[in-house]
Amino acid sequence: MSEQPTFEDKLQQLESIVSQLEKGDRPLETALADFQTGVGLVKDLQKTLKDAEDTLAKVIDNDDELSDLELTND
């Protein structure tokens, strides 16, 4: 059974893709495939961050501390 990549693994992969795309020396088809992979990684990373944010808000709310915690979606 294969381990799921961690948040950090996905972020590192995204950084690598961005670096390769910035060089501009990849064939169009490869660049498009890399871009699609990058978009998928961004969505996964955003979901992970949102889930973590929601969990923190619940923990804080359950402890009756900062119950008016505002979450931002920047």
UniProtKB/Swiss-Prot annotation:
One cellular-component annotation, GO: exodeoxyribonuclease VII complex
Record-annotated membrane-spanning stretches: none
Pfam families documented for this protein: Exonuc_VII_S (PF02609)
Subcellular location field: Cytoplasm
Catalytic activity: Exonucleolytic cleavage in either 5'- to 3'- or 3'- to 5'-direction to yield nucleoside 5'-phosphates
Chief place of localization: cytoplasm
Molecular function per GO: exodeoxyribonuclease VII activity
Superkingdom classification of source: Bacteria
BP terms from Gene Ontology: DNA catabolic process
Enzyme Commission (EC) number: 3.1.11.6
Keyword Cytoplasm recorded: yes
Stored InterPro entries: Exonuc_VII_S (IPR003761), Exonuc_VII_ssu_sf (IPR037004)
Keywords from the UniProt entry: Cytoplasm, Exonuclease, Hydrolase, Nuclease
Enzyme class: hydrolase
Entry similarity comment: Belongs to the XseB family.
Summary of subunit composition and partner proteins: Heterooligomer composed of large and small subunits.
Free-text function comment from the UniProt entry: Bidirectionally degrades single-stranded DNA into large acid-insoluble oligonucleotides, which are then degraded further into small acid-soluble oligonucleotides.
Protein name, entry field: Exodeoxyribonuclease 7 small subunit
Species this protein is from: Leuconostoc mesenteroides subsp. mesenteroides (strain ATCC 8293 / DSM 20343 / BCRC 11652 / CCM 1803 / JCM 6124 / NCDO 523 / NBRC 100496 / NCIMB 8023 / NCTC 12954 / NRRL B-1118 / 37Y)
